[in-house]
């Protein structure tokens, strides 16, 4: 009986320590996103300029002029019918105007949190999620639920914390 209580005490203590370490990492992600991620404005042609675009395109994070999920992960690629640059959200072309865009590659690997090591964020957050298949999406996390703009419950392989939704904590 006493051994079980002692074991439970040390497990709780270990979990609290992991959560506090995770929160420090989450704060580093938010600070990095706020201060260090380059935000580019201008036309898509200017953004890509002399950079060769892979056939599948590249993922960009952008701030769009819309109410639901103003931050969105979109894919920049050339349309198959006229080779024009276009943005897509999943299978849908994205026609919302954007304030800025940045490449997902601008987020350092060392700040991404693995779901294996950190199963969920410590508080309600806005996340950039990687599904391990080259697909990225902005996801809201609250009340133990990961939700996309289309309200699909999802579970990524790793995530990058963009912002805390509950600023008071």
What are the language-model segments listed below?
Residues 2-169:
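Structural boundary micro-motifs
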């Amino acid at each position: 009986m006493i051994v079980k209580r002692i074991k439970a005490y040390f497990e709780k203590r270990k979990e609290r320590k992991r959560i506090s370490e995770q929160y420090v990492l989450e704060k580093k992600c938010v600070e990095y996103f706020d201060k260090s991620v380059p935000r580019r404005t201008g036309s898509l042609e200017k953004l890509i300029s002399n950079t060769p675009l892979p056939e599948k395109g590249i993922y960009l994070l952008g701030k769009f002029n819309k109410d639901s999920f103003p931050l969105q992960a979109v894919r920049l690629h050339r349309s198959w019918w006229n080779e024009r640059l276009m943005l897509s959200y999943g299978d849908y072309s994205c026609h919302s105007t954007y304030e800025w865009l940045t490449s997902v590659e601008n987020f350092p690997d060392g700040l991404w949190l693995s779901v294996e090591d950190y199963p969920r964020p410590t508080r309600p957050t806005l996340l950039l999620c990687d599904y391990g298949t080259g697909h990225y999406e902005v996801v809201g996390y609250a009340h133990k639920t990961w939700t996309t703009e289309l309200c699909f419950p999802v579970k990524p392989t790793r995530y990058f914390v963009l912002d805390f939704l509950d600023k008071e904590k």
